[in-house]
Amino acid sequence: MAQFQIECVESRTDGARGQYGSFVIEALNQGQGITLGNALRRSILSDLEGTAIVAVRIAGVNHEFSTIPGVREDVLEILLNLKEVVFKSNNQESQIGRIKVQGPAIVTAGLFELSSDIEVVDPRQYIATICNNTIFEMEFKIEKSCGYRLAEKAVDELSLDFLQVDSVFMPVNKVNYKVEEVRVGTNSIKDRLILQIWTNGSISPQEAISQGATVLTNLFCSLRNLDFKSVDTYRNKEDKKISQVLIEELQLSVRAYNCLKRAQIHSIADLLDYSQEELLEIKNFGQKSAEEVIYALQKTLGISLPKEKTD
């Protein structure tokens, strides 16, 4: 078992939508620092799940290039603002959020009507400004996933009048790592891994490391007890399957086919008992027919008959 320590040497909160953590992992064997740092970085950035708005329906709006009377922002600006909203959620199912505000008012994410298992990380996140007594009404679909998803033109039957949004699901904004050599004792040199993580506030840097490590653990656990099938076993199964093929599959000429049938050769297994030399000994089976069979075997099944009979 690996013997090393991990310590958080710096931690801070940068507003409602930013957390930073710096961690030191030591002492690792030489080379393990890069291995662990690179694997953790890729896993944390690519595999962690987050929650984001994926589609929006605004009352009276048909496309993203529309404007809304009484609202300062056009629809495209509102969609960009919604893209920046960060959520916390453990629910894997799609959710619907709503908002209905009568102006004049400033619309923020804190006014969203959400289910109890979804939380807005920054309630002050700006969405739009209503300049008069206009009623601003909107529904939006929230999903949990990984990575980044571009707005899809093809929507499901439940979203016919929804506008699609480019969605950022990644809860971690940035990961850096650095490996330093440290001397342990008099002769031993080890690796020290320094890991820096910036999140969007939906998870802490500590949670990011834990979740990233869990992903890697589950990935590598499947490699611990692999059931390797021998090449010979595989070949035997394939040979058995091929040998059961009937000679009709070779699509031979009528003359060659009838000669084989009269010689009681009905399958590839029967044919493999013959060499090229023995084929010519079959009654009325000439050189041309033999060449036809040899070619068909090679082309159809990749099989070559031996030229001479082997004892």
Curated annotation (Swiss-Prot):
Residues 1-227 are annotated as: Alpha N-terminal domain (alpha-NTD). Its main location: plastid. It is found in: Plastid, Chloroplast. It comes from the Eukaryota. It catalyses: RNA(n) + a ribonucleoside 5'-triphosphate = RNA(n+1) + diphosphate. Keywords: Chloroplast, DNA-directed RNA polymerase, Nucleotidyltransferase, Plastid, Transcription, Transferase. The keyword Nuclease does not apply. SUPFAM superfamilies: C-terminal domain of RNA polymerase alpha subunit, Insert subdomain of RNA polymerase alpha subunit, RBP11-like subunits of RNA polymerase. Residues 242-311 are annotated as: Alpha C-terminal domain (alpha-CTD). The keyword Nucleotide-binding does not apply. One of its GO terms (cellular component) is mitochondrion. Its EC number is 2.7.7.6. GO terms for biological process: DNA-templated transcription. Belongs to the RNA polymerase alpha chain family. In plastids the minimal PEP RNA polymerase catalytic core is composed of four subunits: alpha, beta, beta', and beta''. When a (nuclear-encoded) sigma factor is associated with the core the holoenzyme is formed, which can initiate transcription. This is DNA-directed RNA polymerase subunit alpha.
